[in-house]
A protein has these predicted regions:
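S-adenosyl-L-methionine
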Residues: 1-55, 68-71, 210, 217-218, ...
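Class I SAM-dependent methyltransferase SAM/SAH-binding core
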Residues: 52-85, 94
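Short alpha-helix
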Residues: 148-169
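Class I S-adenosyl-L-methionine
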Residues: 162-219
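A short glycine-rich, Lys/Arg-flanked "PGG" loop and its adjoining helix->strand segment in the class I
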Residues: 119-134
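A short acidic, Gly/Pro-enriched loop at the edge of an enzyme's catalytic core
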Residues: 95-108, 114-115
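Conserved beta-strand signature within the Rossmann-like core of class I S-adenosyl-L-methionine
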Residues: 131-144
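C-terminal lobe and adjacent flexible extensions of AdoMet/dcAdoMet transferase-like proteins
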Residues: 205-262
Length: 262
């Protein structure tokens, strides 16, 4: 709660969801940016930023805001905040049909910082943008990992092929709260660091033409995870139905490395 501000009603992020949430400061900045750049009757699409959607819902804004979200734990929280101008669509961004989502004046997205996710998010966002609309993206800054400079060039090239022109790029403009699982791991390792050490660059694109390319191919592994929550700690277990019967299943946990933390 100390670091999540008004967003502590969400369950703790789980590593499998690739979920790093912006701080309240960054969410307020993004909310102001979105509202100032849109007319009162514009529609806004949010991809992968539930805290931004929650913040906009709480402001009781005039613009209509829609979020596409597949994480059911997040969806349950967001539905408590949704109202006439704030709509939650339960769906997978990797599979969502842009024609079913409609067209928007602004799309704001914060995809996981991995290549396949970026291409899928950008493709869907571009297909849902009106001509002249804006795409606002959080991207990993330089030195995030080896080769990130080449990855960014490839992403920007993909944006250009979608008719998107880079309007502005602000280094380390956004900050993130350290998720509990990361904080727990650093604490166990004896490392002391700021809970806001992670930053993202903010890129703004404008849709200048309606060029489109085919949706990038991506096959996501279909895994059946069973989640158990113990005193706020979310544990997921991969289940093979063929190996589980009605008599139950004994589970033993053994650490793979010293100081391993759940």
């Amino acid at each position: 709660r100390k670091y999540m501000g008004d967003f502590d009603f969400f369950k703790k992020p789980h590593p499998l969801d690739f979920e790093w949430r912006n701080t309240k400061k960054s969410v307020d900045y993004l909310s102001d940016l979105v509202l100032q750049s849109n007319h009162l009757d514009d529609e806004i699409l949010v991809l992968g930023m539930p805290t931004l959607f929650a913040n906009l819902c709480r402001r009781d804004i005039s613009q209509k805001v829609t979020i596409v979200e597949r994480n059911h734990a997040v969806v349950d929280c967001l539905k408590e905040l949704s109202h006439d101008n704030c709509q939650v669509i339960v769906g997978d961004i990797f599979k969502s049909d842009p024609e079913m989502l409609g067209m928007y004046a602004t799309v704001v997205m914060d995809p996981p910082w991995y290549e396949p996710h970026f291409y899928q998010f950008i493709w869907l966002a571009s297909r849902c943008l009106k001509l002249g609309g804006r795409l606002i993206i959080s991207i990993p800054p330089f030195n995030t990992r080896p080769g990130i400079d080449k990855e960014r060039i490839a992403w920007f090239d993909f944006c250009q092929k979608q008719g998107l022109c880079l309007e502005s790029l602000s280094p380390k403009k956004l900050e993130y709260s350290m998720p509990f699982f990361e904080w727990n791991a650093t604490r166990s390792a004896g490392a002391l660091t700021s809970p806001f050490w992670r930053h993202g660059d903010l890129a703004v694109f404008q849709k200048l033409n309606m060029h489109f390319v085919d949706r990038p191919e991506y096959e996501e592994e279909n895994v059946d995870w069973h989640e158990v929550e113990i005193k706020g700690c979310r544990i997921r277990i991969k289940i093979n139905d063929a190996e589980v019967d009605e008599t139950g299943y004994n589970l033993d946990l053994e650490p793979l490395v010293a100081t391993q933390i759940l």
